[in-house]
Structures are given as C-alpha cells and as structure tokens.
C-alpha cells in the first residue's frame, strides 16, 4: 500500500498497537528547556524512576535567559529558579545540558539541527509547541505537555493517535525578495489559523525544494500556526549536505548507510492525502500580519480588510476585535503604519541565513529615530558565525542592538518585551494579544522586511529598494 512520508515515519516507530487503544510510539530524541520540564523531573523523583535513556535527551536554557548578560539572576527570581532547577535535574539524571556558559547554548529548535541532534527519520518531541521546526529534516516532530515530558523521560515512548494527512504544494518559483517566512504566512493566510487542525502537513513543490534548510525550518516552525500537529519536508541532497559532519551526525560507513535510508523517506507517488492545498509561488508577495493571529495577514501592497468582508461571523468578530487591539483601521496600507520596535530573532528566524538577509538590508543605513531594533542570534554558534562574517558590526553601525542568544522578545518571559501600545515588526511566529508584552502589538514579517521597517520607521515593500531611506 502506498504511504505518505508521515505514515512511513509513524509506522516505523510503533512499539505497540492493539484495537481500541492509542498506539505507543518510540521517541528517538527528547529536547528539554527550563520552562516545561521542572514538574516532569519532580514526577520522576517522586516515583523513584530514572530517565530511561538519558543519552537521547538534550537540554538547554532559552526562554528565560537574558540576551544582555550571562548572569542567571538577570531576568528575575522565577527565571533563575527554573534555570537552577534545570541544572540540578540534568546533573542528577545524567542529561546533556547546554547551559548559559556553554558555547552551544541557544534556542532549543536552533541547536538541535545545527548540532546534528535532529536527524531525518526520527521522532522528536519537546515541551514546546514549535517543535514542528525539526520536521524540515523529514523527522516527525511535535510539541508535548509537561505530563508527556515525564512519560518520555521515564519510558522513551509516547501514546500518539494517527493524524490526518495534508499536502501543501507550492508550485513554481517565488519572486525576488520572497522568503520562506512569506511563503508560510501566505499559506496560513489561505488556510486560516485553524485550517491544519488534526493534520500533519507535508510541504512540497518546486518552491519548497528550492529552499535552504534554514528556510525549510522557518516553514515547518509555523505549521503549528495553522493548527497542524507537525510539518514535514522530505529530505533530499540539500538536507544531506547540511547534516554532513555535524557533531551528532553519523560518520564514515554509518553516514552512507544513513543517507541510503534517508533517501527512502518520501511520500510514494500514488500516496493518498486527506486534504491537498495548492499555492502558486509567483503570486506570493512580502507578507505582514495585521491582526492577532498569523492567519490575519496581507501582502504589503494590499489594504487591511474590513470586518464586513468576512462572510463567517466568527472571523468577522475576530477581525473587529483584532483591529481594535492593534489600533488599526480597515482600508489603510501597513506601509502607512509607524512602528516603535523591531525584533529579529526567535526559533523562526534567528539562523545565519536570516541574519545575513537582515544585514544586507541594514548595511549603510541607520535605524529610524525613535525606533529600537534588536538582533538576537539563535545560538552560540550562530552568534560566532555572524561575528566572524562581520554581521554584528553592520548591525551595530546601523543602530541595531546586537544581543546574546535566547528566545528574547518572541514571548514576554524575559526582559525583552513590549510596553503597552508599542508596535513591533517581529520575525517571530505568534502575534497573539500580549505575546510580546501586555498591550504590545505584533506584526509578523521576514528578517529583511523587519530590517527595512527599522530603517524607515514603518513597513515598506522591499521589492522596491528606493523606498529605503
């Protein structure tokens, strides 16, 4: 029987499947951070259980860390306690930890792939909704809750029901200045923020195959923002080139064996999907969100829609509420909207390719008066690579703040946050009410669009560079 990539990955990891029970899957990799793990470790301790396979669990500190200092006390007592608990738990249970002073420390969904911890064909879980990022490598990766974190620590398994399958094909070539962020925002704009609920989504098509691994990670990172359980891209030569030689990647003969297996990880030509969505890549323009979920998005050359334009009463009410929160009027263009802050970073867009794209826009320009712009690399290795290329100097000379690795302003769990009423051009993944700080207003964009907004003090269409001041 023909199978989709998701079905192949799922079936390869079944430990136990019996009638009237949710199948039990084996988990190859478990990623842990300081926020969703303390109660799970406490549960193990209370029950007297060890971590079943500590060598398959990797931990880092990212959500609560300061991006201005390595001082564990910098972000307050709760952050300090959570990080201290993670250090204690990893030491006690024998888990590898990339702590604040480790050169590999960074955002969990950045360090997994760059260290080769993430490999094609794996099942990967983390107590974080954006675990879908790792699906860019053809691995089945999804976020789990704290009780499930404990279950995986204790057994290296997890009960997981089969999901429906969705194929999203992006046909043709994208235009100039169009990035993976624009592609995925355009997809979510078409499906809506709940269009993928109950599905595992496989992204394919010429435009997807042309993406770098960084771009594919951006794409899969936001699969959750359309409601999907996970996102997938079939591994190919781009994947293998990226993986070769990384710390935890197979070496020598094992590498050749691994690649031979990885090449089988693709949907069969006659595989059946529950739903198919097609997008014409040539029609995708630079995207900017206007509302309070990622599906409320428009092309930069479009006007903000009126609530009356939505036939669905729920969508209409959501649009009315979003416009009120964002203090925007229907019918205007986002190029007319001034911004206060710019955030370039997050597990969506903090990799070296993202920073290069932003630096290319920033070079030779200055951040607009009254705008604060921060650039936060996703990991220690990304920071080191960017500094070796001189990107930090480009940003600093342009008036951007160059920070230390961490989740930063993606979420209001550290010192980087918006004040009430502040408007931010952000390369992160969520524009919910209060996501970046109570009363803060978030517009999701690509790194290049964010850098251009910082320079101009408002959004511009980066396809027309003459707009850059």
Curated annotation (Swiss-Prot):
Cofactor annotation comment: Binds 1 [4Fe-4S] cluster per subunit.
Q: Which GO terms describe its biological process?
A: L-leucine biosynthetic process
The reaction(s) catalysed by this protein are: (2R,3S)-3-isopropylmalate = (2S)-2-isopropylmalate
Per the record, the pathway is: Amino-acid biosynthesis; L-leucine biosynthesis; L-leucine from 3-methyl-2-oxobutanoate: step 2/4
Cofactors, names only: [4Fe-4S] cluster
Q: What EC class is this?
A: lyase
Does the keyword field hold Transferase?
Answer: no
Q: Name one GO molecular function term.
A: 4 iron, 4 sulfur cluster binding
Residues the record lists as binding [4Fe-4S] cluster: 347, 407, 410
InterPro entries from the UniProt entry: 3-IsopropMal_deHydase_lsu, Acnase/IPM_dHydase_lsu_aba_1/3, Acoase/IPM_deHydtase_lsu_aba, Aconitase_4Fe-4S_BS, Aconitase_4Fe-4S_dom, IPM_dehydratase_rel_enz, IPMI_cat
UniProt-listed Enzyme Commission number(s): 4.2.1.33
Per UniProt, what is one Pfam family of this protein? Aconitase
> Which controlled-vocabulary keywords does the entry list?
4Fe-4S, Amino-acid biosynthesis, Branched-chain amino acid biosynthesis, Iron, Iron-sulfur, Leucine biosynthesis, Lyase, Metal-binding
Q: How does it assemble?
A: Heterodimer of LeuC and LeuD.
The UniProt function text for this chain reads: Catalyzes the isomerization between 2-isopropylmalate and 3-isopropylmalate, via the formation of 2-isopropylmaleate.
Q: Which NCBIfam families match?
A: leuC, PRK05478.1, PRK12466.1
Which protein family is named in the record? Answer: Belongs to the aconitase/IPM isomerase family. LeuC type 1 subfamily.
Return the protein name. Answer: 3-isopropylmalate dehydratase large subunit
Q: Whose protein is this, by species?
A: Photorhabdus laumondii subsp. laumondii (strain DSM 15139 / CIP 105565 / TT01) (Photorhabdus luminescens subsp. laumondii)
What gene does the UniProt entry assign to this protein? leuC
């Amino acid at each position: 029987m023909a199978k989709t990539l998701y079905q192949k990955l799922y079936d390869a990891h079944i430990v136990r499947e019996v009638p009237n029970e949710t199948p039990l899957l084996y988990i190859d990799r478990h990623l842990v951070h300081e926020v969703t793990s303390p109660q799970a470790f406490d549960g193990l301790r209370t029950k007297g259980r060890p971590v079943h396979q500590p060598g398959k669990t990797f931990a880092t500190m990212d959500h609560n860390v300061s991006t201005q200092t390595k001082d564990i006390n910098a972000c307050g007592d709760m952050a300090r306690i959570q990080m201290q608990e993670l250090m204690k738990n990893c030491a006690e249970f024998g888990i590898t930890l990339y702590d604040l002073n480790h050169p590999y420390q960074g955002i969990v969904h950045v360090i997994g792939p760059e260290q080769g911890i993430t490999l094609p064909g794996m099942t990967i879980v983390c107590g974080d909704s954006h675990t879908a990022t790792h699906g860019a490598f053809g691995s089945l990766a999804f976020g789990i809750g704290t009780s499930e974190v404990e279950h995986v620590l204790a057994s290296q398994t997890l009960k997981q029901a089969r999901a429906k399958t969705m194929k999203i094909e992006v046909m043709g070539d994208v235009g100039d200045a169009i990035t993976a962020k624009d592609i995925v925002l355009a997809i979510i704009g078409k499906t809506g923020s709940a269009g993928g609920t109950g599905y595992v989504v496989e992204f394919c098509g010429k435009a997807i195959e042309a993406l770098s691994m960084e771009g594919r990670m951006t794409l899969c990172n936001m699969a959750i923002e359309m409601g999907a359980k996970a996102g997938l891209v079939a591994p190919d030569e781009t994947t293998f080139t990226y993986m070769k030689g990384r710390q935890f990647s197979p070496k020598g003969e094992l590498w050749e064996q691994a690649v031979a297996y990885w090449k089988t990880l693709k949907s069969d030509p006659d595989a059946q999907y529950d739903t198919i969505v097609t997008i014409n890549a040539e029609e995708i323009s630079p995207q900017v969100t206007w509302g309070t979920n990622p599906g409320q998005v428009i092309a930069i050359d479009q006007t903000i829609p009126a609530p009356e334009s939505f036939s669905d009463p729920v969508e209409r009410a959501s649009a009315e509420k979003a416009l009120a929160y964002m203090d925007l009027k229907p019918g205007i263009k986002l190029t007319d909207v001034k911004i206060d802050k710019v955030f370039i970073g997050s597990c969506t867009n903090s990799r070296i390719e993202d920073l290069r794209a932003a630096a290319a826009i920033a070079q030779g320009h200055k951040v607009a008066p009254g705008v604060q712009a921060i650039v936060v690399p996703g990991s220690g290795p990304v920071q080191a690579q960017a500094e070796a290329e001189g990107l930090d100097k480009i940003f600093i000379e342009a008036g951007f703040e160059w920070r230390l690795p961490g989740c930063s302003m993606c979420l209001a769990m550290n010192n980087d946050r918006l004040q009430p009423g502040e408007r931010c051009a952000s390369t992160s993944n969520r524009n919910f009410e209060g996501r970046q700080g109570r009363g803060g207003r978030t517009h999701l964009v690509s790194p290049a669009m964010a850098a251009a907004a910082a320079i101009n003090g408002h959004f511009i269409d980066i396809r027309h560079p003459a707009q850059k001041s």
